[in-house]
Protein backbone atom coordinates (compact mmCIF):
# COMPACT_ATOMS: atom_id res chain seq x y z
CA UNK A 1 0.00 0.00 0.00
CA UNK A 2 1.21 3.46 -0.86
CA UNK A 3 0.37 5.55 2.22
CA UNK A 4 0.61 8.78 0.25
CA UNK A 5 -2.22 7.68 -2.10
CA UNK A 6 -4.54 6.26 0.54
CA UNK A 7 -4.44 8.77 3.36
CA UNK A 8 -3.28 12.19 4.39
CA UNK A 9 0.15 10.74 5.23
CA UNK A 10 2.99 13.25 4.93
CA UNK A 11 6.46 11.75 5.10
CA UNK A 12 9.10 13.35 7.28
CA UNK A 13 12.80 13.35 6.41
CA UNK A 14 15.88 14.00 8.51
CA UNK A 15 19.61 14.09 7.78
CA UNK A 16 22.15 13.52 10.54
CA UNK A 17 25.95 13.84 10.22
CA UNK A 18 28.74 12.83 12.53
CA UNK A 19 32.54 12.69 12.30
CA UNK A 20 34.36 10.00 14.27
CA UNK A 21 38.06 9.72 15.08
CA UNK A 22 39.20 6.13 14.67
CA UNK A 23 42.66 4.98 15.70
CA UNK A 24 43.58 3.29 12.41
CA UNK A 25 44.40 4.30 8.84
CA UNK A 26 41.44 4.84 6.46
CA UNK A 27 41.99 1.56 4.59
CA UNK A 28 41.66 -0.42 7.84
CA UNK A 29 38.51 1.45 8.86
CA UNK A 30 37.06 1.00 5.36
CA UNK A 31 37.63 -2.77 5.57
CA UNK A 32 35.53 -2.90 8.77
CA UNK A 33 32.53 -1.19 7.11
CA UNK A 34 31.17 -4.54 6.01
CA UNK A 35 28.22 -6.61 7.25
CA UNK A 36 30.47 -9.60 7.90
CA UNK A 37 33.28 -7.67 9.61
CA UNK A 38 30.80 -5.55 11.61
CA UNK A 39 29.80 -8.68 13.53
CA UNK A 40 33.37 -8.78 14.89
CA UNK A 41 33.38 -5.25 16.31
CA UNK A 42 29.73 -4.31 16.98
CA UNK A 43 28.05 -6.18 19.83
CA UNK A 44 24.54 -7.33 18.95
CA UNK A 45 24.94 -6.91 15.16
CA UNK A 46 22.53 -9.48 13.74
CA UNK A 47 22.66 -9.83 9.95
CA UNK A 48 22.16 -12.28 7.08
CA UNK A 49 24.27 -11.97 3.96
CA UNK A 50 21.92 -12.38 0.98
CA UNK A 51 24.30 -11.76 -1.92
CA UNK A 52 27.97 -10.92 -2.32
CA UNK A 53 30.39 -12.28 -4.93
CA UNK A 54 33.33 -11.93 -2.52
CA UNK A 55 31.51 -12.78 0.71
CA UNK A 56 32.23 -9.27 2.01
CA UNK A 57 31.18 -5.65 1.35
CA UNK A 58 31.17 -4.71 -2.33
CA UNK A 59 28.96 -2.73 -4.69
CA UNK A 60 25.75 -4.70 -5.15
CA UNK A 61 26.09 -6.59 -1.85
CA UNK A 62 22.67 -7.26 -0.29
CA UNK A 63 22.10 -8.16 3.35
CA UNK A 64 19.50 -7.85 6.07
CA UNK A 65 19.80 -6.80 9.68
CA UNK A 66 17.29 -7.44 12.42
CA UNK A 67 16.06 -5.80 15.56
CA UNK A 68 13.47 -7.32 17.87
CA UNK A 69 10.01 -5.96 17.15
CA UNK A 70 10.74 -4.78 13.61
CA UNK A 71 10.76 -6.37 10.20
CA UNK A 72 14.25 -7.10 8.88
CA UNK A 73 15.98 -4.06 7.39
CA UNK A 74 17.14 -4.68 3.82
CA UNK A 75 20.49 -3.14 2.86
CA UNK A 76 22.05 -2.62 -0.59
CA UNK A 77 25.59 -1.31 -1.03
CA UNK A 78 25.26 1.23 -3.84
CA UNK A 79 28.90 2.40 -3.85
CA UNK A 80 32.09 0.85 -2.52
CA UNK A 81 35.26 2.75 -3.41
CA UNK A 82 38.53 1.48 -1.96
CA UNK A 83 40.50 4.46 -3.35
CA UNK A 84 38.37 6.98 -1.43
CA UNK A 85 37.44 4.62 1.44
CA UNK A 86 33.75 5.36 0.89
CA UNK A 87 30.73 3.08 1.18
CA UNK A 88 27.17 4.13 0.41
CA UNK A 89 24.12 2.12 1.40
CA UNK A 90 20.41 2.21 0.65
CA UNK A 91 18.33 0.56 3.36
CA UNK A 92 14.64 -0.11 3.81
CA UNK A 93 12.87 -1.05 7.02
CA UNK A 94 9.47 -2.25 5.72
CA UNK A 95 6.41 -0.44 7.03
CA UNK A 96 8.63 2.26 8.53
CA UNK A 97 11.40 4.06 6.66
CA UNK A 98 14.02 4.18 3.92
CA UNK A 99 17.53 5.56 4.41
CA UNK A 100 20.65 6.55 2.55
CA UNK A 101 23.82 5.97 4.56
CA UNK A 102 27.29 7.21 3.61
CA UNK A 103 30.49 6.28 5.45
CA UNK A 104 33.77 7.81 4.27
CA UNK A 105 37.14 7.50 6.02
CA UNK A 106 39.88 10.06 5.42
CA UNK A 107 43.39 10.39 6.77
CA UNK A 108 43.38 12.09 10.15
CA UNK A 109 47.16 12.01 10.56
CA UNK A 110 49.29 9.91 12.91
CA UNK A 111 47.65 6.61 11.85
CA UNK A 112 44.11 7.86 12.58
CA UNK A 113 41.04 8.39 10.43
CA UNK A 114 38.29 10.95 10.39
CA UNK A 115 35.16 8.98 9.51
CA UNK A 116 32.30 11.01 8.04
CA UNK A 117 28.91 9.34 8.55
CA UNK A 118 25.65 10.63 7.08
CA UNK A 119 22.19 9.15 7.52
CA UNK A 120 19.26 10.57 5.53
CA UNK A 121 16.05 8.89 6.68
CA UNK A 122 12.64 9.25 5.03
CA UNK A 123 9.48 7.91 6.62
CA UNK A 124 7.29 5.49 4.67
CA UNK A 125 4.55 5.37 7.31
CA UNK A 126 3.46 7.02 10.54
CA UNK A 127 5.76 4.55 12.36
CA UNK A 128 8.60 5.98 10.28
CA UNK A 129 7.54 9.51 11.19
CA UNK A 130 7.67 8.55 14.88
CA UNK A 131 11.14 7.11 14.35
CA UNK A 132 12.29 10.38 12.77
CA UNK A 133 10.73 12.51 15.53
CA UNK A 134 12.79 10.61 18.09
CA UNK A 135 15.95 10.32 15.98
CA UNK A 136 17.28 13.58 17.41
CA UNK A 137 20.76 14.96 16.88
CA UNK A 138 21.61 14.04 20.48
CA UNK A 139 20.37 10.46 20.09
CA UNK A 140 22.24 10.05 16.80
CA UNK A 141 25.44 11.42 18.37
CA UNK A 142 25.06 8.94 21.24
CA UNK A 143 24.82 6.06 18.75
CA UNK A 144 27.80 7.34 16.74
CA UNK A 145 29.92 7.76 19.89
CA UNK A 146 29.22 4.14 20.83
CA UNK A 147 30.14 3.03 17.29
CA UNK A 148 33.35 5.09 17.56
CA UNK A 149 34.20 3.66 20.99
CA UNK A 150 33.54 0.05 20.02
CA UNK A 151 35.49 0.27 16.76
CA UNK A 152 38.47 1.81 18.59
CA UNK A 153 38.16 -0.81 21.34
CA UNK A 154 38.09 -3.58 18.73
CA UNK A 155 41.14 -2.18 16.95
CA UNK A 156 43.02 -2.07 20.26
CA UNK A 157 41.85 -5.38 21.80
CA UNK A 158 40.32 -7.49 19.02
CA UNK A 159 37.00 -7.55 20.94
CA UNK A 160 33.73 -5.62 20.72
CA UNK A 161 32.48 -3.49 23.58
CA UNK A 162 29.31 -4.80 25.19
CA UNK A 163 26.28 -2.79 24.15
CA UNK A 164 24.18 -2.07 27.21
CA UNK A 165 20.96 -1.63 25.21
CA UNK A 166 20.96 -3.72 22.02
CA UNK A 167 17.34 -2.77 21.29
CA UNK A 168 17.97 1.00 21.35
CA UNK A 169 16.65 1.46 17.79
CA UNK A 170 13.20 0.30 18.96
CA UNK A 171 13.05 3.24 21.35
CA UNK A 172 12.99 5.58 18.35
CA UNK A 173 9.91 3.75 17.01
CA UNK A 174 8.08 3.83 20.34
CA UNK A 175 9.09 7.34 21.29
CA UNK A 176 10.89 6.24 24.47
CA UNK A 177 14.29 7.49 23.31
CA UNK A 178 13.02 11.00 22.63
CA UNK A 179 11.88 11.34 26.24
CA UNK A 180 15.41 11.04 27.63
Segments predicted by a language model, with ranges:
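Ser/Thr- (and often Asn-) enriched beta-sheet segments in non-cytosolic proteins
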Residues: 15, 19-21, 46, 62-64, ...
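Hydrophobic ligand-binding cavity/cleft-lining segments
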Residues: 1-55, 176-180
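Short Pro/Gly-enriched beta-strand edge/turn motifs at strand-loop
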Residues: 1-3, 56-60, 82-88
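Hydrophobic pocket/interface hotspot
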Residues: 28-33, 39, 63, 77, ...
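Terminal "cap-and-tail" regions of soluble proteins that handle hydrophobic small molecules
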Residues: 2-13, 107-180
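Hydrophobic-ligand binding "helix-grip"
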Residues: 40, 67-124
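Short, P/G- and charge-enriched loop/turn segments at secondary-structure junctions
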Residues: 4-8, 62-64, 89-91
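Residues that act as N-cap/strand-start positions at coil-to-secondary-structure junctions
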Residues: 14-16, 57-59, 71, 97-99
Amino acid sequence: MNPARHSNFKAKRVTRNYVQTIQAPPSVVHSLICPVKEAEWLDGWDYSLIFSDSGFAEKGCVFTSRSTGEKDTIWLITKREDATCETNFARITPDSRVAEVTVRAEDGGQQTSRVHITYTITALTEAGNRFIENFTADNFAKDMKFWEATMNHYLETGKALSQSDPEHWLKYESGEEGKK
